[in-house]
Amino acid sequence: MNGRIRQNQTAYNPYSTSGRNNRNTINSERDESENGSLLMNGSSSPPNNQQTNKAGFFKNMVSKLLSKPLQWMFSNFDESSSSSSSSSSSYDDGNNIPQKGSSTTTTNINNNNNNNNSNSNSNSNNNTNNQNNNSNNNNNNNNKINISDDYDSNLSKVKVPSGINFDTSSLSVADLTRSYQTNISNKNILDNKPILKKDQNPTTTTTTTTAAAVPKKSVAIGGVTNNDKKPTTTTTATTSILKTNINSLYPNLSQDRINANASTFNSSRNIKNNLSPTQTTLKITNNNTIYSNSQFKKKPISSTFNASPFESSIINSSSILSKRKQFDDNNNSNINDNQSIYNRQSIYSPNSKIEQPPLKKRLPNADGTDNSVMMATSQAAKRILEHLDSFSNPVLAHYNPSSTMAPSSQSLYNGNDSTYQPPTSVYRPKIKIPQISINYKYNPYGLSKLLEKKPKSNKDLGLEIPTNSITSSVSLYKKPLNKKSEDESTEPIKTYATPSTTTTTATVANTSSSSSSSSSSSSSSSSSSSSSSSSSSLFSSKPATISSNTTTTTTTSSPPSSSLFSTTSSAASTNTATASSLFSATPATTIATSSPSTSTSTSSSSSGNEKKLDNMFTSDSNKSNLFSKENDGGGVNPFKNLATTVSKTDFIGINGVSTSTSSSTSTSKSSPIAKKDITSINKSAPYEKKKRGLENEDTPLDVPGLKNIEPPSGLFNFSGIKPIETTLFSVSTTTPLATTTTASSSSSSSLFSSPPTTDKSSADKSSADKSSTDKSTSPVTTSIPSFTSSSTSTSLFGPTTTTTDKDSKTASIFSTKPTTEGLFSKPTTSLTSSSLFSSTITTATTTPSIFGDASKSSTSTSLFGSSNTTTAKPPASFGVNLSAAPKKSSPPPPPESDEEDEENEGDEGDEEGDENGELEAEEAFYVPPDSDEENEGDGNGGDLEAEEEFYVPPDSDEEKEKEKKPKTKQQSTQLTGLFAAPPKGGSLFGNTPTGGSLFGSAPTGSSLFSGGSLLTSSFLTKKGENDDDSSDEDSNKKRKKKRESSSSSSTSSNIIIPTTSKKEKIDDKPSTTTTTTTTSLFGSTTTSGLFSNPSTTSTGSLFSSNPLGSTASTSSLFGASTLASTATTTATPTTSLFGSTTPSSSSSSSSSSSSTTSTTTPSNSLFGTSSSSSSTSSSLFGSTTSATTPSSLFGTTTTSSDSKSETKTTPSLSSGGLFSTTSASPFSIPSSTSSSGLFGSTNQTESKVATTTTTAATTATPSTSLFGSTTTPSTSSSTSSLTTTPSTGLFGASSSTTPSTGLFGSATTPSTGLFGASSSSSSSSISSSSTTSTTTTPSTGLFGSTTPSTGLFGSTTTAATTTPSTGLFGSTPSSTTSTTTTPPNGLFGSTTPSTALFGTSTPATTSTLTTSTSTTPSTGLFGSSSSIATTTPSTGLFGSTSSSTTNTAPSTGLFGSTTTSTTATPFGSSSSTPSTGLFGSSSSSTSSSLSSSSTTATQPTGLFGSTAPSTGLFGSTTATNPSTGLFGSTTTTSTTTTPSTGLFGSSSSTPSSTGLFGSSSSTTSSTTTPSTGLFGSAAPSTSSPFSIPTSSTPATSNPFGSNPFPTSSPTTVSSTPSSNPFGAPSLSNSTSSSSLFGAPTTSTAATTTPSFGSSPFGAPSSTSSTPFGASPFGAPTSTSSPPFGAPTSASSTPFGAPQISTSSSTNLFGGASSSTAAPSFVSSPFGAPITSSSSSSSSSLPFGAPTTSSSSSTPFGASPFGNSMASTTSPFGAPAASPSPFGIQAASPSPFGAPAASPSPFGSTPSTAPNPFGNFGAVPANGFSLGKMGTSKKPAKKK
């Protein structure tokens, strides 16, 4: 599906049998359980503070699943089109007119055919959120069209509030003065033809704007609001059909009211609207103008009949459209805030002296002037509402006013935006409101009469222009939510008081079985297992209350969508509202420009009245919560959101200019950045040069506020932290990635951020700078993703480099000081660690690194080579120095012109000071090729020209580099690197002493990755004040700029900011050379490159460890392994990303004994863990095998250590680990009490000693973790306990008796998880009989549940289930005793014939495939591979591979049905009734002979025809009546009397057809008239190029025709098949041809089934192995292996729901079974697996709910996101004892997990276990290495 499901747009359902355009039918029930329908309204609007692409892994993964559900299947989805695509995301099946703009095709996945499913499922689970209750009956009705903000060229100046949605799905009335055509009017839809007349040629301009729309509360999976996509609102403005269509559409309109002659709308339009200037200005105010000043009509306007049959006083008195709550315009809050009222006063004001509001207003321009665009007001919509009263009255027959009693204390849209005063709530009764669309066929004048009515009070008010459609107006009235528990009240739905009512239907789970039912799509719902007032539902949240004293901004308000994935509402208000969601961070303040929008914010954080979030991931002031930590007080929160200041930051572009101001309450002195940095940011941008004409387009460079930038210091978080806070994914209150508030703290450690703390000496220096304006009181918050230094901060990605204060420790992974413990810095302690790309340093002379070790020996062995660094001064800049290498023989540079000065203006300030690590932002990785490289032909610099493909940016002029070339002659030693070049060479990876190679690292070289280049870290470091003197060659201007921008010297490594650094001259001051040792990305010479191994005085490189003699143990990116330590062992381990640099505690331990080394300090690496049992690991995923509990993310021990590196291990279960066993950690694994860990609670031991036997207490309540709760066994056996309450985790709960509402469903009981639930099992053993469940209610998981569910991918139906699932991919076949009578209608079908998208694989009642008695095939998209005895084929898209002999009706699939039979016809089976598939159906035939098929009378009308004559597109193959297909029909016998009139004619019959290309007339003499096709006809004697060859012309290869069927015997069959691309192929005796659509024959025998040779689209026969049947999209037969079809037996279809098979297959989505006893999902990534006691071990599904077998190693159940069992291998689940990549497993081989002794690619297992990454992780004991490094020497200090 090209594009994604945009906001308010429903997914396409190919099986909506109720009609895809009949919105009256589809939308007639806008009531309960809209959450039950999956992917219907995945709202794609991002929160205002969320960059779309800044999301993390899980959010990206899930949001792509939810918002672009099938783009990986159907189209070459361009990610860039996510914000600009105007294509409709509806799958056009020919019924819908192709719609430009944001067309809404209202379909329902939950098909009405499955009403019986919901009836049998409605009341069976009281504890589950009955999301599938009536889910099949209730279609999602949020039919809103996002009308673009710029339907006119004037709208570029219009302040239209972003996200205004006009729902014109039912009715699109053109603006009579403007006639912009939103999509297609109803008349067009009903008539299926455009309005345009023949002579019209409208220019249609489709403009797409992305606005920070208000996030809608919409139904996503299980109610997950997916608010991370910008809404793409598209308007197709048709500007030339107005003057010709206004009169035809509205014949009664007078021309004086409409200037129909104006083709474009301009301000000179003469409209007699008599509107005052204030009335014509569109105002977004807090007044309830949308409900006020409306005229009240006593009786509804009748549409077509005089007296409305419903105009009784009783009905009118309770009309839901005319009677509404009265609002007080003077009071902006709801009347009777704490009292439930259903005020029967009309929503309309009385028809009184109040001035009628205008029906249209002028939109204001951005500058405040009136725009020429007129916009219909809500008054026009109210007219339609009044008109529709008669339509809506009948629904009140069973109306109970008590059901609408709701207080106004809560509302659906709890917008926290300061502009959003609490609007008036509209109570809608909990009744069904019919969706009324004015049907021009049946109501041709009703709307026109309505529009032509003038207001009663004001004749001259002007023409009423109802822009809002009737549907949106009706859906404006929200019905109240369902009743909560006793202390909770029903929320009224708040609607935005804007002309475009943001309407989202808050559905109510219409359940009577449980009072705690959850409506996942509504803003608040009861928890499924408690009746407390805290709405702790997984996907819904408790709405936030808005304080009324908020600051008014113009940002669109984001209501707190407290759902699973939604972040909290962005509120400019400091009274941050509460919202609870799984990923809900703290109330993020409005980041005005975090997304492209026109909103601005001037919020102030002076009051600091912030309320606490109240769901399981956020907590009160003293609790540790998952994503937020409120106060300075207790709790270590990994995912803390630092909401201490409310700061408004503008997103900083590459030019680095921040235009925002901030009022911060932080008292910490922000670390000022020297002007040098700002100028380098602004002026070094390659496109900021005057040569490019862009110099003056942005903010002036010397903005005083910018001198005081507090740089962000962390990948995910930046400053703004007052307390010492340890956060995992901490984000500042200003959510944008590159945003930081201006606050710093003395010490704080977070996993992904380290709040920068200004070093006092550095701060004093920089404030003492000459031209510095650091005294600015309001530091501008900057969004530059750079890293500043802090004194003591430990963060994962926060490379807080230490400042000149050498005592400060910054344990960040990117830190590069020798004293720091950065992840990407290398340890400086000798023999204490090795890095990813360099192995153990065993001697003082060899530090081998595969990516180059810039050691000082001339024989350093590196992958990219390393240069001799003995005479080289280390380039002090960690940026890419991309200018050519300086050479001694370089001529003096020509004097710089002014253009050059401007061009290198940012560089000039840096050139003298680069030795101190000055970093320039001039280069992005894209390098503009505008430099003056004059010595490009030289051997050293020749290969770094700007012409190279690597985008080598010219640093500046080549001559400037050559000015700074060291005068000393470089030592030309031969390098021994893998790609090393000769000393003078300029090879790609070669390194000469003077550099010049791409990856070379010359001492002063200018190679791409050499040490003062690509990723210099000196951007935000302060430069020494003695740097001001520059070389004499420098101009005074440069020297002046340098003084202005010099900053104090420090060392910092930065990986994010690509900058260019100039090489210093040799004769610079010594202070610049001695104080800086910066790290380049891919290695410098003596400085530590990314892959190089620096000298002892150098800072750590990214991937290598420090050489010998170092004093600090800073490990590199992938960890330093345990090194034999002959030097002093540091007590503090290095913090490597994937490995733990576990320093040996023994001073004499060798590298071979690293597996027995005991360290006293755990490593703080991301995935690493310490390798010893006595040590603790605080790594992200690592845990140890020791009795202690590491305080890692998934660890199980607590490591308390102070800044002095003194570590104290606390072996308690209340650790700070992510999955610690106490409820103190949100990720903790529950012990006796169920904690709500992020990844569920795994089976953890109560004892202090971790044993292999997991003995955990029985948790009565599962944790509501992110991925569900892993079941806590009640016994010591990890496979015998089932919790009684499922968790509502993200991916559901693993097996428990009660289904959870997890994202992936729950185990054992059908849950409503995203991927369904794994099968329920009645036995206590997980590995034993898991198919004996008698669960009768399927789960509604995304991928279905084991029980038939309505999951996305169907459900794996368990035995004896009576209701199949309606999952996306259908449900997999139930086991051998299945008595399923109703097929599921999953996307890919189900085992029972379902209406799945891709059909279903029909079940077998026995273990064999040939005895199935399923009677109804599925109507999947690709048909269903129905079972053997099915009597009705499926109507899949590609037909159904219906079963054999007893099929009576073929399917009507897209490509027909391959209905098998006793005959072997080219298209499949002999069924009594052919199907009407797209490509026709294989004709039914009663004989088994190919040459003598006696087809039945009824022929299918497939696209390509059918075997029987049909009216297919390409005709049909033969029968008595030819088809009229596009390409005609390949008729066979001479008895055919009527040829087809296909596009390409028909293959012969007695009268030839008149196809486009004529008809290939038959060979019989009875054909008297050849066809008069475009290319003529193939007369019997002639062969037209396009005709279908006859038996007389067998060798003819027509493009479109095909050989007809043999008329007599197989011997007369043509020996050569035609290779026609489109036609139906002939049955030939030779090999198959490769026709595009046709199906060539493959056999020589007449009785064999012809195959679809290589036909991508045709529907194959049962014995073929063709792509389309076993076709990628067709429903394959039992022996085929199609990608998409649902295979029957041994096939390996990727998508279809697999058939129970005797052999295992590898389906992408389906689950093929591997045994006859019980089906299993063999390797289906997405399908929900079947629970099997025998073959479930071979299943490895990424997404499906896992099987309950303990031996199964499925990724997704034991799934990466599912709730894995205790012993399964789950990438993402956190099972207690499973080898899980991301789990917390201690002793398992896991790719990313950090088991203590496992061969982990990224783990830090230093043991002798085989390590896939070899030296990357902890090196093996033998010290694996790629080579030897030369002797390491100290870099020569130059003077």
Swiss-Prot record:
Residues 896-923, 944-958 have a biased composition (Acidic residues). One of its GO terms (biological process) is post-transcriptional tethering of RNA polymerase II gene DNA at nuclear periphery. This is Nuclear pore complex protein DDB_G0274915. Residues 80-90, 102-148, 329-343, 495-568, 589-607, 658-671, 739-760, 774-803, 827-837, 846-871, 1005-1021, 1046-1060, 1071-1092, 1129-1242, 1250-1292, 1311-1384, 1397-1498, 1522-1673, 1712-1810 have a biased composition (Low complexity). Pfam families: Nucleoporin_FG (PF13634). Residues 1-27, 35-54, 91-101, 344-354, 616-628, 1093-1106, 1293-1310, 1507-1521, 1676-1708 have a biased composition (Polar residues). Transmembrane segments: none annotated. GO terms for molecular function: nuclear localization sequence binding; RNA binding; structural constituent of nuclear pore. It comes from the Eukaryota. InterPro entries: Nucleoporin_FG_rpt. Coiled coil: none annotated.
